[in-house]
Amino acid sequence: MTTKTRFAPSPTGFLHVGGARTALYSWLYARANQGEFVLRVEDTDIERSTPEACEAILEGMQWLGLNWDEGPYYQTKRFDRYNEIIAQMLEQGTAYKCYCSRERIETMRDEQAAKGEQQKYDGCCRDKAPRDTDEPFVIRFKNPTEGSVVFDDHVRGRIEISNDLLDDLIIARTEGTPTYNFCVVVDDWDMGITCVVRGEDHINNTPRQINILKALGAPIPEYAHVAMILGDDGAKLSKRHGAVGVMQYRDDGYLPEALLNYLVRLGWSHGDQEVFSIDEMKQLFKLDDINKAASAFNTEKLNWLNQHYIKELDPEYVAKHLEWHMADQKIDTSNGPALSAVVTALSERAKTLKELAASSRYFYEDFAEFDATAAKKHLRGVAMEPLELVQKKLAELSEWTLEGIHQAIEDTATELEVGMGKVGMPLRVAVTGAGMSPAVDLTLFLVGKARCEQRISKAIEFVANRINS
């Protein structure tokens, strides 16, 4: 039998990290078992579901590279199918019409609460014949009253729930629309889902859904209920912890590989290994290895992984992701070095692509002024002679090469009988406007000969004005 999993988000907001991790685990389980992965949009909450949220979820999945084999399916386009199954269940006697008013239900629950009893529907309409009336009604599933539901969860082990604790679940509302718990069951059956991976907040729904599947004569999938993600204060991760949608991580400069690597480790492990390629995840991932305890989100760890991937991935690939940030920061890269070369030069220090883009601006644009601290320290009177001499030697280079630039700087230091830093630091500030950059010869090479000439002249003028002031 082909392994088939699904990710079934509700389009009421962005794709958050918890949902992304669930999608990743489900996707990995399918890929690890040469199976299929289905994307399904559970949009039955018509009032809260929006096209914008749906688009954000699809965009997030695509950016992460979690490709799907089927879908996206939309529940709102399957109402005819749900109604067909409900009609069958009414005819078979596994569902019934409930005419109890909202007021009666509320009174019943208040009385149960006052007695310390479990609050659930009392079955008033369960065995009554349907009425020939225009009274409003809901449709309820006739849950078994004896026995129990037993299932083996990949994460939590064996779970058993007595049927007398379960309600007669509403499967169709008064206006006729099917409910979430019912739609999920029909979808999983129709789509041949063999394993359901989802958050632990759904675990109470599972025995109810299993009973509906049994009533339909449908196969029961495997289940894996994943623990929640916590903030650093031990509370459930939320917006107040800075929890954001997946695409915000793109906007903040994270690579999809870094976020996927971080999310897979947020509850799953393989020995002490921290860094996993996508291929390694596919080979090693097992649902049974997921930790049942909640995991705490750690931004520092994510930053460490992101820096690792910026340094280790192919610069051409990283440059493709960097393009978005350059455009976002309005940096025109048409007149300057190849972005891949900039990635190679700056990758050692950048934690995010957003930082990398910001620190690369001087390769493409002239700066208005020198950093005050760097200028105060390095563009002093003693810098005049090294700057003038190195400018002359650089201008004499017939070819603009790393070797030639390095030799010009070294010859200047030798001729003036000073250390390389006495030439290199003023030169760095002159060309970049700041006190930090990659190796000064590489920096000059990427900035280009003409720009270097102009900027060194500007620095010499700055030093002269400082001497004369």
UniProtKB/Swiss-Prot annotation:
Signal peptide: none
Source organism of this protein record: Shewanella sediminis (strain HAW-EB3)
Cell compartments where the protein resides: Cytoplasm
PANTHER family the UniProt entry points to: GLUTAMATE--TRNA LIGASE, GLUTAMATE--TRNA LIGASE, MITOCHONDRIAL-RELATED
Functional note: Catalyzes the attachment of glutamate to tRNA(Glu) in a two-step reaction: glutamate is first activated by ATP to form Glu-AMP and then transferred to the acceptor end of tRNA(Glu).
GO biological process entries: glutamyl-tRNA aminoacylation
GO molecular function: ATP binding; glutamate-tRNA ligase activity; tRNA binding; zinc ion binding
Annotated motif 'KMSKS' region, positions: 236-240
Gene name of this polypeptide: gltX
Recorded GO CC terms: cytosol
Family matches, as InterPro entries: aa-tRNA-synth_I_cd-bd (IPR045462), aa-tRNA-synth_I_codon-bd_sub2 (IPR020751), aa-tRNA-synth_I_CS (IPR001412), aa_tRNA-synth_I_cd-bd_sf (IPR008925), Glu-tRNA-ligase_bac/mito (IPR004527), Glu/Gln-tRNA-synth (IPR000924), Glu/Gln-tRNA-synth_Ib_cat-dom (IPR020058), GluQ/Sye (IPR049940)
Protein's UniProt name: Glutamate--tRNA ligase
The enzyme's E.C. designation: 6.1.1.17
Binding site for Zn(2+): 98, 100, 125, 127
Keyword GTP-binding: no
Renumbered ranges of motif 'HIGH' region: 9-19
Assembly, per entry: Monomer.
Domain of life assignment: Bacteria
Assigned keywords, A-Z: Aminoacyl-tRNA synthetase, ATP-binding, Cytoplasm, Ligase, Metal-binding, Nucleotide-binding, Protein biosynthesis, Zinc
Catalytically driven reaction(s): tRNA(Glu) + L-glutamate + ATP = L-glutamyl-tRNA(Glu) + AMP + diphosphate
Broad class of where this protein is predominantly found: cytoplasm
Cofactor(s) the protein requires to work: Zn(2+)
Sequence similarity: Belongs to the class-I aminoacyl-tRNA synthetase family. Glutamate--tRNA ligase type 1 subfamily.
List of residues binding ATP: 239
Cofactor mode of binding and number, as noted: Binds 1 zinc ion per subunit.
